Amino acid sequence: GAVAQTTPTWFYYDTLALRYLGVGRFNQMYPLASILRHGGKVTLGSDYPVSWIGKDALNPMFNIEMAVTRQQAGNPEVPVQARVSERLSVDQAIRAHTSDAAWQLRLEDQIGTLEVGKLADIVVLDRDPYVSDPYSIHTIKVDYTFSDGRLVYRRP
């Protein structure tokens, strides 16, 4: 099946794109929810170092928030990147960073989900993104990171 690999850092209301593409094509940009509804897969990455948000692009929580809101992280006042119906759920955005990304790399038997026999690459967050205000997801911090089951990072 088809895989759309993109970065949510592009999902902000872009007046230049609207002007150059026109309303019809502008409203067709980034149809991620439609791709998922039709059986495709979506994977998300950072686009670092060329992304407009700089080093924040390296933080998946920024990308997850922008995939969920289709707005600049932490900025609910800016217009929504058309179409609101193309927003991803928190679960879809997390899967796009984990299990679906592993599938795209053909490594789903080794990484991407927590299962016996797979590498234990785990982050422990300070808050649950599933119940957090969507506009605060970018502020969620990583408390611990485990790589292949070993603690490699502990937030000071």
Residue ranges and their predicted role:
Residues A2-V131, Y135, I140-D148:
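His/Asp/Glu-enriched, well-ordered alpha-helical/loop segment
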